[in-house]
Structures are given as C-alpha cells and as structure tokens.
Amino acid sequence: MFDITRKCVEWGDRLLVIESGKIARQADGAVVVDYGGTSVLSTVVSQKSKEPVDFLPLTVQFLAKSYAIGRIPGGFFKREGKPSDRETLISRLVDRSIRPLFPTGFCDEIVIVCNLLSYDQVSPPETVALIGAAAALAISGIPFPTPIAGAKIGYIREEERYILNPSAEELARSELDMFYSGTKSSVVMVESEASELSEEEMLGAVTFGHENCAQVLDLIEEFAEAAGPKDVVEFVPHDIGKVVSDISSGYSEKFSVAYSDHNKKTRVLQLDAAREGLYSDLCRKHVEESGEYTEQEVLLAIKTFERSLVRARVLDTLKRVDGRGFDQIRNIEIEVDLIPRSHGSALFTRGDTQALVITALGTPQDEQVVDGFDGDRRERFLLHYNFPSYAVGEAAALRPPGRREIGHGKLAWRAIHPVLPTKADFPYTIRVVSEITESDGSSSMATVCGASLALMDTGVPLKSSVAGIAMGLIKEGDRYAVLSDIIGDEDYLGDMDFKVAGTKDGITALQMDMKIRGIGFDIIEKSLQQAKDGRLFIIGKMDKVIKESREGVRDHVPRMESMIIDKNKIKNVIGTGGKNVREICEKTGVKIEISQDGTVMIYAVSRDAVEEAKNMIMCIVSEPEVGKVFSGVISEIAKYGAFVSFLGGRRGLVHISEIKNEHIGSVSDVLAVDDKVKVLVIGIDKDHVQLSMRRVDQDSGDLLEHESYSSSKKNGPQSGDASGGASGFRDYASGPARERRRSGGSGGRPVRRRSAGSSGSGSGGYYSVPQHVGTPDPVNGNDRRRGSGPQHASGGGGNKKPRFF
C-alpha cells in the first residue's frame, strides 16, 4: 500500500532520517524528517496564480502543536490558537532560505506547511523544518533547481570551538546563536545573535555551517533521486526581451529622470506615474492586440527594466540612487528625552527613515509569561516594532503586527539583548516600543539605534552603545558593489539585504537575506568590514548625544527595592492567611514578592510608599533590644500599667511608674486603647518585654538626655510606690496579687494574654540609642537606619518559588 523511500545519515552526533511515501500522499511533495528526537512533517502544494503578479506567491507556515512535547494546551478551549512568535520566526527562516532559489519568472502559488510532530528539546526544529521543506520540494516536481540545507551554530569563545546544532544546555553557554542556510556553492541566509563577536569569528561560524551542511545536501539529492517527482511542473521562461526593448526605447528617459531625483517622496510619485502609463500601453500592444504575452509577463518586464537601469547606473557611474558613494551614510539626527512622561525616549532619523523609540519600566510581575514548545519561561525584555502605513505615505487601515513586524522586532531584540544588565543588577522589566514614523529602508536598524539611545536615556545600565546598519549588493557577473545604509529602492532592486548590529567591540546581531542564489565568502567578508566602518561611524554620532546611561531612573518610574530577612521570619511577614502582607499592601499601595531565600522585593509607584512598607516589614522582623526606641499602639489598659503592641504584634508592658515623670492616679486617665506611643525597651525577660514611656519624647521619639536608661536607675519619681522598680519583669508585670487575680491569672499572665487589637503597629521605624539621639522617625521622612534589623540588599528577587501579593 505504501511506497516508502527512506534515506539516513549520521550528522553531528545524531541520526538524520528523511522518509516519504507513507503520510500526506496527496500533497505534491511530503516528507517526514527525524533528527534525534525531533520530527517534522513537511508538505508542498502548488497551483497557478489566480491574478497576474510579478513576484513569487510563496507561503511557508511552521506549526508546533503541544502534543509534540506531550502536553495539552492551556486555556479554556484546549486548542492551539494563532501562531506564536516562535512559530512565525521559524516560518520566516524557511521562507527566506528557499525563496531566492526558485527560477525568475516562476509565479505559481506555493504553500509549504511544516508540522512539528515531536520535539526532544535538543535538536533544533528550525533545522529539521528547512531540511524537510527542501526535500519535499525536491520530489514535488516544482522547479527548484538546487537543494538547500540549514543548521544552527553555537560558539564557545574560551575553547574557540563551534558547535553544530547545539542543545539548549550548550546554547546557554554559547556566545553565538546562529542559523545558517546555503547550497553547495553559496550562502543564502544567516540569522544570528552574538555576544560582541568579531567579524572574523562570525565569518568562521558561517564557514563552519557551510562545511557541515554538505553531507545533508548530498542526502537530499540521494533521496530525491530515489523517490523521484510525482508530476513535473513544466516551466519554460518566456523570453520577455522584446517587451523590455520597447520599454527601453520609449520610456527610458522618464525612468532615468525619476531615479535621478534624490527626494524619496517626489521620486515615488514620478515612478508611479511612469509605471501607470507604461503598463496600460504595453498591455494594449502585447496582450490585447498581439496576444504574445500575458499581463504577468508585462509586469515582470517592467521590473526587469527598472532593475537593469538602476544597477547599470550604480556600477557604471559609481553613484547610487540618492547620489551617495558606496560607503556613505545618510545624514543622521538624534534627539533624546523628548516625550515628557515616558521613562525614556529617543528620536533617531537617518535620511528619510525615522524611528521614535519609547521605553517603559515595570516590576518583575510585569514580565511576559511565555508558554511555548521550548518550555515555559518569563521574559523581562520586550521589544515591539510597529510599522504604520503613514510611514511610507500610504493610506491603509491599521492592522495587528504581521510577520514582518515580528521579525524586525526580534532582530532588534537580538541586537540589544547582549548588552543589557543582569536581573540582579537591574531587576526592572523593560519594554521598548519602536514606532516607525518614516521609512526609506533600514527601519529595523534605525530601531536598534533608537532603542540603545532610549534605554540609556531611561537609565538602564547598558554595557555599550549599539548601532545597526543595513548593507546592500549590486552584482552583475564578476562586477559587484557593496552599498552601506541602503534605501528602499536599493533594497527592492538589489541582490542582498545584509544587516549588522553591534557595539564598538563586536557584533551582537547579523541577518542576511539574498535575492539571488547565494554569494561567496569574499563578498560576505567585504560586507562585514564595510558594515563595521559604518557601525563605528554611527556610534560616534550617537555618543555625541548620550554616551553613557543616565544615573538612576526618573521619579515617575515604579520604585523597586529589596531587603533580606531571616528565612524563619517569612511566616511572620505573611501572617495567618496572608493577613500581615495584605495589610501592608493595602495601607501603602505596594506590591510585595517574597522568595524562600528571604529576599523581599517591594514595588510601588513612589519612594515614600516603598519606605513605609519597608518600615512595616522591619517592625515585624526586628527583635526588641534593650536601649532601643520603637513606635507602638496601646492594646490593653490595666491598673498597674498599659500593654503596648509593637514590632508587628509583639507585646510589652509599660508599668504605671514608667508612663510619666509625675504621679498618676489611674492609667486610664492618661492612656486609652489604640493610642500611638513611643516606648523604650528597658528590660527583656524571656518573652516578657518591659517598656518605658517617660524616658522618651512622645512627639519626636527622641530619648530624653537626662533620662538615658541605666540599669542602676530603675525607680522613677514614684519611688515610694510599692510597685515601682524597673530592673525585673516581675516588678512591672506582676503588681499586687489582688491585681493579678482581677486580670484572670498570675505570674505575668496579662502579658501573654492576646488582644484583638494588637495585630499591628501604628507606625513603622525604629531608633538606635544613643547613636540616633535626635534622629527623626523614618516614617516621617528620614532614611537613616542603623543598628539591628534586617540587612538591605540591592538586586533582583530570589529565584526559589517567589510568592506575589
């Protein structure tokens, strides 16, 4: 029933298997590729285009279902929705790799679907998907003259060692994350993120990928020969030379004048007018009257003419469309801090390309939770690229971000990511939004420059400035020209889009797309060196505006501070059922994250709220010490004194003799429940705390100088009172026996008795004696804290199951 063709080879340290003839037999081409534990079903179907077009209507879709990793989708519907960004990026990798290899003039609709069947989280699915797509095309009968293969490349700088298809563990140690694709003779596509690698190291990675793909290309050829195509699609390119000659003789002057205009807007208007009249004339002559050509061939002839005109001008006159030299950068204008309430902003303008980049900082609770087939993770750096239609002067409805926006945003993300501080050094969640307000080529690289400037304006401590530049190529036979900072027309009519971003010390991102069937290593090497010169020039311009990140963040940025407490005190801070931490959050308006290692992260919109929350937490975790002053609340009144709740629920007794420096007839005459007081710890007997009010200024909390505590001075002015004395707990807590009986117990029972009103302190803060004599309460604005209490730490929250409140 099944006519199965199967070929395999040992590639790297894993077995690569290509098989067809069993699954999806009605597709023009269908293969299952297994590599290690990763398996992808790739299918190809084609049909004639419904409308005349001058491009290849190719659609590539990579799909990753959760069953590939043995999971059921989350959410209510338990079914996959729209493609994730990761799926979109892999789809683009496959598309950009195979598109240049189709013959010129072939405009049939082609749909390629790569379905991830199994994923071992070791073998990269993008590698398997591209090999599957190439193998499916090879047996489909669709004109695809040469096979292509791809591989993921890593690099360990310390060992000077490149890695073929690294695992996730190896990739975490690698300074390079590159995807390479190419044929036997040339490089077709490169996408990479690097930790400031040199041009030589990047070129070495491309060479390594090219060499290691050779055996896969041999395998695809062997497989295609064994399987054979089902039905060959006949494609014989129609000679459109006659139409091109007609255009050259009658319309060459109009196009030459249009392409001589250095202003993009007027140049576009002239070109549109020339094309409109030309298309109608050619269709009437060559389609309607003679019937010799189709509308699609007329469109292709116009594009061929324009392409040859511009390319000849560049190679013959050594001048580009806008009059620049090959290595000349457009005029650059830079401005930072231009959006008032943003956390940081920059406007980067290069010629007619402009990016308005704005940043926003958030707490770790704002991190994006990514639930993908690579595993769940939290992303703290977000970069979003938006390209509205007005950027190119078009009237079109705004739509959600498409593949292009996602791809350009990811490229800029890769360029900036290697220079960001660690979470321990800068725990904020960072979002960068690039609004492309004008575009004439290289908008993704303008985003890189603008993002670097905006982050420095925000106060994010970047390692270095990052700049990006897009390189182009015009190649005719053995003649070629590498162009720096290409504009839109040079991208449209050229042969290469080669984008390089990095710092003064090295490359952080590289992307190469070809429109011809690949290039040699000599052109890549020249492009890298010319891109380096341009990158350093742009960084010099950027450094004149802002060279280093600003000190600190703006006042309206969410405040974030950390403190470390004893792990045994975590339950005290949380409280029964979260009572204490909820009370802190509700009172101060902060958010609190507590990790199992004792790290407490506090997030708020203002510094005052953070300080108040810190003081409340310190009150809970601090231990009372003799000689320290605390704020507290009267929780219970007794005949012999008053019980005070302080330090988040600790109870102590202020004996009647320690309330005032004068005779008191009754405690209730001067104190009442819920009164806020300042108390000095004068004695601790196990869990029983003896307090004094009379030795402390009740307004400021300062210790009265003539009443500095001394163990020898244990009697107050009421020395004649039978219950006086300050040295022992029993003297303060016990009182006369008849008073103990009225209190419902003996032996200090009143101190142990709980009161419903003793759950919290009226105000936070503590004072050291004698170092802090005259020091105001931290709650009232002073940030000086010494002595006992939790140590403070700066940096990120703990990584052991944090709890959020």
From Swiss-Prot:
One of its GO terms (cellular component) is cytosol. Its EC number is 2.7.7.8. Pfam families: KH_1, PNPase, RNase_PH, RNase_PH_C, S1. Coiled coil: none annotated. GO terms for molecular function: 3'-5'-RNA exonuclease activity; magnesium ion binding; polyribonucleotide nucleotidyltransferase activity; RNA binding. It is found in: Cytoplasm. It catalyses: RNA(n+1) + phosphate = RNA(n) + a ribonucleoside 5'-diphosphate. Residues 627-694 form the S1 motif domain. Keywords: Cytoplasm, Magnesium, Metal-binding, Nucleotidyltransferase, RNA-binding, Transferase. One of its GO terms (biological process) is mRNA catabolic process. Residues 709-721 have a biased composition (Polar residues). Residues 702-805 are annotated as: Disordered. Its cofactor is Mg(2+). InterPro entries: ExoRNase_PH_dom1 (IPR001247), ExoRNase_PH_dom2 (IPR015847), ExoRNase_PH_dom2_sf (IPR036345), KH_dom (IPR004087), KH_dom_type_1 (IPR004088), KH_dom_type_1_sf (IPR036612), NA-bd_OB-fold (IPR012340), PNPase (IPR012162). Residues 558-617 form the KH domain. Mg(2+) binds at D491, D497. PANTHER family: POLYRIBONUCLEOTIDE NUCLEOTIDYLTRANSFERASE, POLYRIBONUCLEOTIDE NUCLEOTIDYLTRANSFERASE 1, MITOCHONDRIAL. Belongs to the polyribonucleotide nucleotidyltransferase family. Involved in mRNA degradation. Catalyzes the phosphorolysis of single-stranded polyribonucleotides processively in the 3'- to 5'-direction. This is Polyribonucleotide nucleotidyltransferase. The gene is pnp.
